[in-house]
Amino acid sequence: MMKKSLCCALLLTASFSTFAAAKTEQQIADIVNRTITPLMQEQAIPGMAVAVIYQGKPYYFTWGKADIANNHPVTQQTLFELGSVSKTFNGVLGGDAIARGEIKLSDPVTKYWPELTGKQWQGIRLLHLATYTAGGLPLQIPDDVRDKAALLHFYQNWQPQWTPGAKRLYANSSIGLFGALAVKPSGMSYEEAMTRRVLQPLKLAHTWITVPQNEQKDYARGYREGKPVHVSPGQLDAEAYGVKSSVIDMARWVQANMDASHVQEKTLQQGIALAQSRYWRIGDMYQGLGWEMLNWPLKADSIINGSDSKVALAALPAVEVNPPAPAVKASWVHKTGSTGGFGSYVAFVPEKNLGIVMLANKSYPNPVRVEAAWRILEKLQ
């Protein structure tokens, strides 16, 4: 509970208003409920968990069912599929590998996968894979690619549409391969490296790539057209969209990324900063490693419209930031994520010590998520 003295404090809120009294826990709950309850009704979402990080402290809220058939409610321990929010874990793990001196973003991809002998891979660097700028790698790896030999065949036969760095085209097949190659020098699998280097140091004890048997009871059912679904296995799924987590762990993830000064492992601290560095500018958005950033303050339309698939999945000109700009505290840092039966959104403003996690067991339009998050955080200014 907040101390009463805190409720009387004043904080500067330059972006939305001049001054506002610090919010009480009840006021925060009211703000969140007024946005999330109608959202769930409009989008027919069975269950949601939301965390708000306000003045650096997390507040948790849950609604509805994690499993309709068995009448299991959503709790603070419920595991949700994060979808592409998993890419932020990939980016931080890659940043950690850079900080350890194991890889460089300027390294050619072929250094870590010499079997990629096709001419099209000459000139493509790890940076391009990590930031979707390799030249037009597709959004998804085809379903018929089921093993490493088929994966190599897929990449060997891919032909770029543009020169590396010309355009950004969002792609699981791009950042997914980055994640797989970034851990090669460690000698560990991607899952092992993620667990040892990121999840365990940050005490994310309920965040998984493979949900263990004893945690299955907390694994929510996702829903698509009213039917329960879980994500299907696929090549590079762990790297691109395969993480599952609870609202408590995701609040901790936001806190660590918002202010890494409390992270004890120096390479992880540096990795978090590298993931929020600015490598390319695409319109008013900056591409990090997994994370995407916009300058703060900003207008709601720029993030809401930018999250629409027509924009987010479009091939857009990329302007390289060279050298990359270090993380900027006055940023809206965010990532959307979806699987067949889940929809997630994470956003934070480091300068304001303010953030939000929204986890749902149904996928629903990204602009709706972003607008809801904006409305909540705007009122907490």
Curated annotation (Swiss-Prot):
A beta-lactam binds at residues 84, 140, 170, 172. PROSITE patterns: BETA_LACTAMASE_C. One of its GO terms (biological process) is response to antibiotic. GO terms for molecular function: beta-lactamase activity. Gene3D superfamilies: DD-peptidase/beta-lactamase superfamily (3.40.710.10). Residues 1-20 form the signal peptide. It catalyses: a beta-lactam + H2O = a substituted beta-amino acid. The active site is at residue 84. One of its GO terms (cellular component) is outer membrane-bounded periplasmic space. Keywords: Antibiotic resistance, Hydrolase, Plasmid, Signal. SUPFAM superfamilies: beta-lactamase/transpeptidase-like. Its EC number is 3.5.2.6. Pfam families: Beta-lactamase. Class C beta-lactamase which confers resistance to penicillins and cephalosporins. Belongs to the class-C beta-lactamase family. The class C beta-lactamase family has a specific amino-acid numbering system known as SANC, for structural alignment-based numbering of class C beta-lactamases, or else the simpler name structural position. A multiple sequence alignment was used to derive a consensus sequence and then the consensus was numbered taking into account insertions and deletions. This allows use of identical numbers, e.g. for active site residues, despite differences in protein length. This is Beta-lactamase CMY-4.
